[in-house]
């Protein structure tokens, strides 16, 4: 099944954690509550030993005052880690070549985390290629050739244990086009495709800022994600059910909506 992870502050006293799932119509689908007891002997305190090797690409300040982004290696063997660090530096430079990241660069720390894989590259199910990699990523998510994700979210966080982070970028060691970004979870993109630099920024917009895709493909697996009678929560798209809550006030008077392509 698909895993997810929450990153609550470690409580000093027993604390209730609640997870609520919503439908695309913003209706509660189901919920789950769990009591976290800090004295529980079955809580594995990871990150105190065996911390994954890592190197800072950018260190602007204390982790308590900055946004900490971890760039994680996927599909890089131990012998390929120098390549990974070079790729991580390219991702960092690409991110801060765009606004608003460029003007806020001093608010970020970027750390490259060298999580090793047994095999080089990533899995491609449609070609019957399954590899043993750090976070078990693969193409063909939802049977879409380009959609590269992993369902092994716990493996991601285990690899990052002991390293300060709030957001995650995973670099896949392949030249095949693809990627994915899941809000408040992770960005995953291929590091050796010609479109790597813009794609990593695009996918980070999904995972970091909660932005939606602004393009459309025929027969896309995500085509029916948004009911047309409900205003999406993402700030960069609209069904015009409540367009005033988005960017309507930024349009010039008499601008037709939808706006014809010119």
Can you say where each PLM-predicted feature lies in the sequence?
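Fold-level signature of zinc-dependent metallopeptidase catalytic domains
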Residues: 47-97, 102, 112-122
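Short pre-active-site segment immediately N-terminal to the catalytic Zn-binding motif
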Residues: 81-84, 179-203
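Catalytic Zn2+-binding segment of zinc metalloproteases
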Residues: 204-220
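Short, small-residue-biased leader/transition segments that mark boundaries at the very start
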Residues: 5-7
